[in-house]
Amino acid sequence: YYAMCTWFDETCGQLIDLLEKRNLRDDTIIVYVTDNGWSQNPERNGYAPRSKQTPYEGGIRTPIMFSWPNGDLKNGKRKDVVSSIDLFPTVLAATGARVPDGLPGLNLMDSLKEQKPVKRKGIFGETFAHDVTDVENPEASLVFRWTIEGKWKLLLTYDGEVNRYKSTHPRTEKRPQLFNLLKDPKEEKNLAKDNPEVVARLAAKIGKWWPVKERKVLTKWE
């Protein structure tokens, strides 16, 4: 794992050196994004639980970094909730192109240049059994869906087929999981039982975002 981190750092350096050698660095936007989190398991050569392939913060909360010397971006670390769906409208805005209406992502340029808060009410995501097994019917391997809105994160568990990834997705808790990410970033205390109105509201938003038809899910604490 650490060797891969070192290799990645070296190859990024080689790319930046090439851009500088060709006098392209100042006008080039570099965006770092990764597909999943990986918390190293100190006891073995692999990732820790609630990390890679899971819907918990250790698996989905990853950094996105922008670098653009001539773009007048403000240096700093932000904690806004953003997504890879924001990359397309952001790069369009950087080039001066018109950002079409109706895109699912947000243009982050104002935030990057002026450190304005990202105007996002909530964000949604889903997890499958490693990958979507059937692109014509993505529900077949749907395992989790979630939404993050403010301090709240609601995680719903579905009955999609996991096949050989059963050990990765044991789904021991099939009831809704609600976490206060500000107080409990490691998602150790499920607050769903004590906050049914929050669960109902966020579950309805998940259903509106992507209305699934075949999968079974519990949206109430039973």
Positions of PLM-derived features:
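Intrinsically disordered, low-complexity polar regions and short flexible loop motifs
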Residues: 184
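Histidine-centered active-site microenvironments of extracellular/periplasmic hydrolases
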Residues: 18-73, 82-83, 133
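A long, amphipathic alpha-helix that forms part
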Residues: 1-28, 71, 94
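Soluble non-cytosolic domains of exported or imported proteins
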Residues: 2, 6-9, 78-82, 102, ...
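Active-site-proximal N-terminal segment of extracellular/periplasmic enzymes that hydrolyze or transfer
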Residues: 189-197
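C-terminal cap/loop subdomain of S1 sulfatases and analogous C-terminal strand-loop tails that border
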Residues: 38-44, 50, 80, 85-88, ...
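Feature captures the catalytic ectodomains and active-site-proximal regions of enzymes
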Residues: 6, 20, 60, 88-89
